[in-house]
Amino acid sequence: HLLQFRKMIKKMTGKEPIVSYAFYGCYCGKGGRGKPKDATDRCCFVHDCCYEKVTGCDPKWSYYTYSLEDGDIVCEGDPYCTKVKCECDKKAAICFRDNLKTYKNRYMTFPDIFCTDPTEGC
């Protein structure tokens, strides 16, 4: 669920996700096209691809269960949709954390009209 994803990102990065990531680069937030602008934007590209692979459910609105153990996200539960969705969100949140040093404020509200490179496939 998007609200759970928000909490994961906040825990992993310390940043407010809606401000910091909702409009970042060419892939963070709604939609996506062109080539990812940097490593953070690539996290969003990979997250979008991960969601595309989740079939038979709507990953954006599926609730899942997770916990934090020693600073690590642990996805819990059994149903396919929720477990896979949680893993997609977990990977993205960790990716954001791992790329904090290269986060660029200039991409924070990047207009998608500048995302003109050919779109990469998953």
Curated annotation (Swiss-Prot):
Protein name: Basic phospholipase A2 PLA-A
Matches recorded under InterPro entries: PLipase_A2, PLipase_A2_dom, PLipase_A2_dom_sf, PLipase_A2_His_AS
Enzyme Commission number(s): 3.1.1.4
Family indicated by similarity: Belongs to the phospholipase A2 family. Group II subfamily. D49 sub-subfamily.
Residues engaged in binding Ca(2+): Y27, G29, G31, D48
Organism, scientific name: Protobothrops flavoviridis (Habu)
Domain of life: Eukaryota
Lineage start: Eukaryota, Metazoa, Chordata, Craniata, Vertebrata
One GO location term (cellular component): extracellular region
Any one biological process term the GO annotation gives: lipid catabolic process
Cofactor(s) named in the record: Ca(2+)
Record PANTHER family: PHOSPHOLIPASE A2 FAMILY MEMBER (PTHR11716), PHOSPHOLIPASE A2, MEMBRANE ASSOCIATED (PTHR11716:SF9)
